[in-house]
Amino acid sequence: MIKDPFARLGLEREVLTVSQLNGRARVLLEDVFSSIWVEGEISNLSRPASGHVYFTLKDSGAQVRCALFRQSAARVRQALKDGLQVKVRGKVSLFEGRGDYQLILDTVEPAGDGALRLAFDALKAKLSDEGLFSAERKIALPVHPQRIGIISSPTGAVIRDIISVFRRRAPRVELTLIPTAVQGREAINQIVRALKLADSRGFDALILARGGGSLEDLWCFNEEAVARAIDACVTPIVSAVGHETDVSISDFVADVRAPTPSAAAELLAPDSSDLHRRVDSLHRRLVSRMQDRLMRERLRLEGISRRLRHPGERLRQQSQRLDDLDMRLRRAFEQNMHQRQVRLAHMQSRLAAQHPGRTLGFLRQRLDALAERLPRAIREQIKARRLQLQSQAQTLNVVSPLATLGRGYSILLDERGHAIRNAAQTRTGQRLTARLGEGELQVRVEDNHLTPVTLSLLD
């Protein structure tokens, strides 16, 4: 306790400026209230772009400004909103520019039972999203367990109730207590260790049990570490935490949730009287089915005995069957021989029809006919070719140059025997040959104008 704060700040009744006053007041407040917890309701919540959070913390009689800077705001897990009842931790400071004092916060937590409820809902949503509550992860409870591990407090009514139920319903089931604290901060680690130990002991099933209590009393069963330890177990677990109205995270993760520890024991301890009744029922069903089976076998045996005859009768039947088979074999052989004979006769007739002698006679007749027709065909062919040749000769005579020469025309040929078609092809004094219809004349060109050429006959 500072008895003389003014002396500590060096104040000796001097006159201060406003800035000096606010500065020294800030130092004093931060020194005295360096870390305090305050509870109140959030109002006027503001989140500027800087990432800082500002709000007013109030109760029914007063209010104070609060600042939660960006790094501290990032560590707050709960969503802040107006009207939320919270507990905050920080230091008292003074904003020198306005002379307003405020709380500079480093921690914000929901207050009271509401805080626990918000934390419960947040963890429940998280584990549900990860699939820890899904039906596919649940392990079925054994029908007739022989060894059961109980994770609970060694004192109190819970363990006595569980043992009482098993003694009454299934006294032969072996029970093993894995003691652990079930309340307080130490309970979390103890429950996790007890779960790992029990899961390694090869029990048929486990019971995680605690009696009723407040939400705070049962909170260790709502911790994430306990939930994940339950999920990691390969042994089926029955969660029996609190009364029937109490619900914990452990109930959701466990394979089966029982409303009370006694109910959990009843789930794993089938009533011996019920078992006796079930055995009696199964015995009656077994006897009935055996009697039915004996009756069916007796009837079957009688049927077989009726079908069973004397060996002599069996021999007579076999002899008769052998005679029948012999007759059928003979008949089949005869039918086969007949079919083969018919087929052979058919093939002989086809072979006779295709004999070479018959084919040769037919070909000889055809050759004689062709030999008789050949001279006549040759004469007719020669006659037709002669007529065709005469017709072509007449046609050739009509278009032949010799026929033209026979009508008084002639053809002039130069020294190389080429026909002269134009006067320009000649020269004066050139010797030419004039071919007539009969014979030739040697001529000489006297003049070769385009006018008719003048020729003179050579001696």
Swiss-Prot record:
<dbReference type="GO" id="GO:0005737">
    <property type="term" value="C:cytoplasm"/>
</dbReference>
<dbReference type="InterPro" id="IPR025824">
    <property type="entry name" value="OB-fold_nuc-bd_dom"/>
</dbReference>
<dbReference type="GO" id="GO:0008855">
    <property type="term" value="F:exodeoxyribonuclease VII activity"/>
</dbReference>
<comment type="similarity">
    <text>Belongs to the XseA family.</text>
</comment>
<dbReference type="Pfam" id="PF13742">
    <property type="entry name" value="tRNA_anti_2"/>
</dbReference>
<dbReference type="InterPro" id="IPR003753">
    <property type="entry name" value="Exonuc_VII_L"/>
</dbReference>
<keyword id="KW-0963">Cytoplasm</keyword>
<protein>
    <recommendedName>
        <fullName>Exodeoxyribonuclease 7 large subunit</fullName>
        <ecNumber>3.1.11.6</ecNumber>
    </recommendedName>
</protein>
<dbReference type="InterPro" id="IPR020579">
    <property type="entry name" value="Exonuc_VII_lsu_C"/>
</dbReference>
<keyword id="KW-0269">Exonuclease</keyword>
<keyword id="KW-0540">Nuclease</keyword>
<comment type="subunit">
    <text>Heterooligomer composed of large and small subunits.</text>
</comment>
<comment type="function">
    <text>Bidirectionally degrades single-stranded DNA into large acid-insoluble oligonucleotides, which are then degraded further into small acid-soluble oligonucleotides.</text>
</comment>
<dbReference type="GO" id="GO:0003676">
    <property type="term" value="F:nucleic acid binding"/>
</dbReference>
<dbReference type="GO" id="GO:0009318">
    <property type="term" value="C:exodeoxyribonuclease VII complex"/>
</dbReference>
<keyword id="KW-0378">Hydrolase</keyword>
<dbReference type="GO" id="GO:0006308">
    <property type="term" value="P:DNA catabolic process"/>
</dbReference>
<dbReference type="Pfam" id="PF02601">
    <property type="entry name" value="Exonuc_VII_L"/>
</dbReference>
